[in-house]
C-alpha cells in the first residue's frame, strides 16, 4: 500500500470509527464503511487538509471509494 493509501486509510479509520481491516481500496465510503453524506464531506475536507490539495465539489462527487480518493490525491499532488 502506498504512503498516500496508508494516510487515506488512517483518516478514514479516525473519521468513521471503522476497523482498519475494512478500509480497502475497493471499499465504498457509503455502502461498505457506513458513511453518510456529512461524513463524506468531512472526509473530503480532511483529505484536503492532510494532503494540501483542493478537491472541487464536482470531483468530490466522483470519490466514492478509498481507491478513488487515493487516485485523485496522487494525481492532484503530482
From Swiss-Prot:
Residue ranges of domain Carrier in the record: 2-77
Q: Write out the GO MF terms.
A: acyl binding; acyl carrier activity; phosphopantetheine binding
Q: Which organism is it from?
A: Brucella canis (strain ATCC 23365 / NCTC 10854 / RM-666)
Coiled-coil features, chain-numbered ranges? none
Q: Which family does it belong to?
A: Belongs to the acyl carrier protein (ACP) family.
- InterPro entries assigned: ACP, ACP-like_sf, PKS_PP-bd, PP-bd_ACP, Ppantetheine_attach_site
Among the Pfam families in the record, one is PP-binding
Q: Give disulfide pairs as residue numbers.
A: none
* Protein's job: Carrier of the growing fatty acid chain in fatty acid biosynthesis.
Give the protein's recorded name.
Acyl carrier protein
Q: In which pathway does it act?
A: Lipid metabolism; fatty acid biosynthesis
Localization: Cytoplasm
Q: Which PROSITE patterns match?
A: CARRIER (PS50075), PHOSPHOPANTETHEINE (PS00012)
Its Gene Ontology biological processes? lipid A biosynthetic process
> One GO CC term of this entry?
cytosol
Provide this UniProt record's keywords sorted from A to Z. Answer: Cytoplasm, Fatty acid biosynthesis, Fatty acid metabolism, Lipid biosynthesis, Lipid metabolism, Phosphopantetheine, Phosphoprotein
Amino acid at each position: 500500500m502506498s504512503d498516500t493509501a496508508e494516510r487515506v486509510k488512517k483518516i478514514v479509520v479516525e473519521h468513521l470509527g471503522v476497523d482498519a481491516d475494512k478500509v480497502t481500496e475497493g471499499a465504498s465510503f457509503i455502502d461498505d464503511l457506513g458513511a453518510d453524506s456529512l461524513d463524506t464531506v468531512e472526509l473530503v475536507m480532511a483529505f484536503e487538509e492532510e494532503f494540501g490539495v483542493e478537491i472541487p465539489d464536482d470531483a468530490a462527487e466522483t470519490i466514492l471509494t478509498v481507491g478513488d480518493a487515493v487516485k485523485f490525491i496522487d494525481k492532484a499532488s503530482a
